[in-house]
A protein has these predicted regions:
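N-terminal export leaders
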Residues: 14, 24-28
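Extracytoplasmic "Venus flytrap"
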Residues: 50-86, 110-116, 139-140, 205-212, ...
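Beta-alpha junction/loop-to-helix N-cap segments that form part of ligand/metal-binding clefts
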Residues: 51-53, 65, 78-85, 97-167, ...
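Short, solvent-exposed amphipathic alpha-helices that sit
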Residues: 79-96, 118, 158, 186-189, ...
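Extracellular/periplasmic Venus flytrap/periplasmic-binding protein
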Residues: 121, 166-167, 174-278, 315-324, ...
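Periplasmic-binding protein-like
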Residues: 126-139, 159-161, 203-206, 254-264, ...
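Extracellular/periplasmic periplasmic-binding protein-like sensory domains
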Residues: 271-346, 406-410
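Segments of small-molecule ligand-sensing domains
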Residues: 332-344, 354-410
Length: 411
């Protein structure tokens, strides 16, 4: 399978950060805004922990098969590709140093184009044909929702899906392990920021599926805490760029801000539609939009000022040890590697999974892997801490807000 990445170009001064939330489990030391570009460009390499090995690679031992279904083609492909690249940077490093208990890691990634029926067929193949030990790095709420019955039936762990949906958190799902913060936490942060800025007329654009419904519910809840309701609500079909009607509908309510719950193809199209109508509303996206993909889809300064909530550290801040490690291994994988929030999330998720696999022992089963996750003490990946336990599989509540500029970050 071809490995693909995105190009970012950096220009100092375009990033703003506000309202950092450490959460109850995740802590991150963020330096002042004006130092971030300098650190990204000039901070010397920080000595990093090497990928751990619990023994030399033994070629006669069976591989540890990790199964992933994600969009690797189609309108939302960059999300799946970037997550996979970040994860592979760590998995390949582990394999170079002997694997896990002498066993090589093999990530099998199947393309679902962000369409639930394909996710279902891919998952059956991963479980029945490929004999995956664990499902890892699935992308999207509607796609993950479609395979939850298989997860429950086969009792296979689903680790670090790229979704903050409530349905993976409430009620508790014993086979689902969430790394990222919930969409509720993200929307709470952005609504609090908008209200503090005096923007009370808040509209919502949502994807017409499980993801959009979850984000819409979260926005209602966040606004309700301030005694507010959405001034207008419009929907858009998944993967669609036909957003002119939705823009006109919201524009009639004269919103001062719009919370957008969609992937980057629809979000970018809607941003162009709304700007074309002369709106000055502040646009806010949840992290699933894919920051780099959104910037790529809005060239020439069209993305300037758009807000995006983030659930991982800033990928260019090498003062955070795990970010420096991520950059080093990404460069080792590919000369001139591009960094980004989604690939960093994949990298962090891969590190979390291998820590549990090490703890599960030389002959891991699905049950042993679950026990290993739940039995781990707080895991500090190097400035990004994760903690779960029996009855609570939410590892991080970290949320940060970023605002895009006319130039893209880079590399």
């Amino acid at each position: 399978m071809a490995r693909m990445s995105q190009r970012f170009c950096f220009r100092p001064g375009w990033l703003q950060k506000i309202g950092v939330t450490s959460g109850r489990r995740t802590t991150l030391a963020l330096l002042p805004l004006m130092l971030a570009p300098l650190m990204a460009a000039s901070t010397p390499d920080v000595p990093q922990p090497r990928p751990r090995s619990t023994g030399a690679m033994q070629t006669d031992l069976p591989e540890l098969v990790l199964g992933q279904s994600a969009p690797l083609s189609g309108p939302s492909a960059q999300l799946g590709r970037d997550y996979r690249e970040g994860a592979l940077a760590w998995f390949n490093a582990v394999n170079r140093r002997g694997g896990i208990h002498g066993r090589r890691l093999r990530l099998i990634s199947l393309d679902d184009r962000y369409e639930p029926p394909l996710t279902q067929s891919n998952t059956r193949q991963l479980i029945e044909t490929e004999r995956a030990l664990v499902l890892f790095g699935y992308v999207g709420t509607p796609t993950v929702k479609a395979i939850l019955p298989m997860v429950d039936q086969t009792q296979i762990p689903l680790v670090a899906p790229l979704t903050g949906a409530r349905l993976l958190r409430q009620p508790f799902r014993p086979m689902v392990f969430n790394l990222r913060a919930s969409y509720q936490a993200e929307v709470d942060q952005m609504v609090n920021s908008l209200v503090r800025a005096g923007r009370h007329r808040i509209a919502v654009l949502h994807q017409e599926d499980a993801f959009g419904e979850d984000g819409l519910r979260a926005t209602h809840s966040a606004l309700g805490r301030h005694g507010l309701k959405p001034v207008a609500i419009a929907g858009v079909k998944r993967n669609s760029t036909a957003t002119d009607a939705a823009a006109r509908q919201l524009m009639r309510a004269d919103p001062s801000a719009v919370v957008i719950i969609s992937a980057y193809p629809s979000s970018a199209a809607f941003s162009r539609s709304l700007q074309g109508l002369g709106s000055t509303a502040q646009l806010m996206n949840v992290s699933f939009v894919g920051t780099g993909a959104l910037q790529d889809a809005l060239p020439g300064g069209q993305a300037s000022g758009i807000g995006v909530s983030q659930v991982v550290p800033f990928p260019w801040n090498r003062q955070v040890p795990v970010v420096a490690e991520y950059q080093r291994l990404m460069r080792q994988e590919q000369r001139g590697a591009r960094y980004g929030f989604t690939s960093l999330e994949g990298f962090l998720a891969a590190r979390w999974l291998t820590a549990a696999l090490e703890k599960a022992g030389p002959n891991p089963t699905r049950q042993r892997l679950v026990a290993a996750f739940e039995g781990m003490p707080e895991l500090d990946l190097g400035g990004f801490k994760l903690k779960i336990g029996p009855g609570d599989h939410q590892a991080s509540d970290f949320v940060d807000l970023t605002f895009l500029g006319a130039q893209r970050w880079g590399p």
